[in-house]
A protein has these predicted regions:
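Conserved beta-propeller blade signature
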Residues: 62-65, 111, 117-120, 164-168, ...
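Beta-strand-rich domains and repeat architectures in extracellular enzymes and scaffolds
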Residues: 40-70
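Loop/turn-rich, solvent-exposed surfaces of beta-rich toroidal or solenoidal domains
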Residues: 205-249
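Short loop/turn segments immediately following the C-termini of beta-strands
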Residues: 67-69, 107, 121-124, 168-173, ...
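Structural signature of eukaryotic scaffold interfaces centered on beta-propeller domains
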Residues: 48-59, 95-115, 151-163, 215-225, ...
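Blade-level signature of beta-propeller repeat domains, shared across WD40, Kelch, NHL, RCC1
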Residues: 267-291
């Protein structure tokens, strides 16, 4: 039986009850559907076997799974199963390119597009905005966004509920910064460059100022849902287990740390919500946690 350990903020030890693949937990609620969850394997990833998996997001029943070099695979989740639809290359595709985090925005470039614009966190903190054309025919560059501050890594995510753009930044000393911006405007038929300044941030704070618990090491991707920032971390090893941190963006506090080390010994790369279920991507498969 798969067993989950949940750790909560303020170093509270949780009480966990186990049933038929359903796991009850106590503490602050992960705000999806209920105060318990089930775990299911949604399917094996079918991308390029030679490349590592990175970011993932879901919109309109389609999951876009990104890999190093800028290859993306589109999966159709509408039929209940995870079926491969198309494999494409981002406009930034190259041998050294990365798509550490991918996040759907709130705007489509054209009415015919099935998916909203895709915000791709690449090398050196650069954020590339991409249009996936209707019927997944091609991927086009729309905008390049940079930030005037230097960090070891920046994972960008759009909050589909509020329309704000979040930057989860890793400092050189291992601490983390959260910044919130308005989403820069895009125009059809125009590829633009936007240079954000730290002074443009609507909010900017150090996570460790509000939280002194378990260090967030080996963070991979971020996702915003219902006022909470989901942070995937860990390499799936005994010394660096796969964990999902849930950060309250309004209260500026850690709500949960979900330990998935016994569910998967793989890297936990990305997550996204679809039909009230939290899909998580590892280096081999997609799982869904049904809350």
């Amino acid at each position: 039986m798969v067993k989950f350990n949940l750790l909560f903020a303020l170093l509270i030890t949780p009480l966990v009850c186990f049933g038929q693949n359903a796991y009850d937990y106590y503490g602050e609620k992960v705000q999806l559907e209920a105060h318990y969850f089930q775990s299911q394997n949604a399917g094996k990833l079918q991308g390029d076997k030679k490349l590592s998996y990175q970011g993932m997001d879901i919109s309109n029943g389609y999951a876009v799974s990104a890999q190093s070099t800028g290859v993306i695979t589109v999966y159709d989740l509408n039929g209940g199963d995870m079926s491969k639809e198309k494999q494409l290359k981002l406009s930034t595709f190259s041998k050294t390119a990365n798509a550490y985090n991918v996040s759907f925005g709130t705007k489509k470039m054209t009415e015919e597009d099935v998916l909203p614009l895709l915000y791709v966190s690449g090398n050196h903190g650069v954020l590339n905005v991409e249009q996936i054309e209707k019927k997944f025919k091609n991927v086009n560059a729309v905008q390049t966004i940079t930030l005037d501050a230097k960090f070891s890594k920046i994972d960008w995510a759009v909050d589909a509920d509020t329309g704000f753009l979040y930057a989860f930044c890793t400092n050189k000393n291992g601490t983390h910064q959260i910044m919130r911006f308005n989403v820069p405007e895009v125009k059809e038929g125009e590829v633009s460059t936007v240079k954000l300044k730290t002074s443009d941030a609507l909010d900017n704070y150090l996570v460790e100022k509000y939280y002194q618990g378990r260090s967030m090491t080996s963070t991979h991707g971020v996702y915003v849902h219902d006022g909470q920032l989901y942070i995937t971390s860990g390499n799936g090893t005994p010394n660096d287990a796969s964990r999902l941190y849930v950060w309250d963006l309004c209260g500026k506090m850690l709500r949960n740390v979900i330990d998935l080390s016994t569910a998967t010994r793989d890297e936990l790369k990305a997550c996204s919500v679809h039909n009230g279920e939290l899909y998580v991507q590892t280096q081999s498969s997609m799982y869904k946690l049904i809350f």
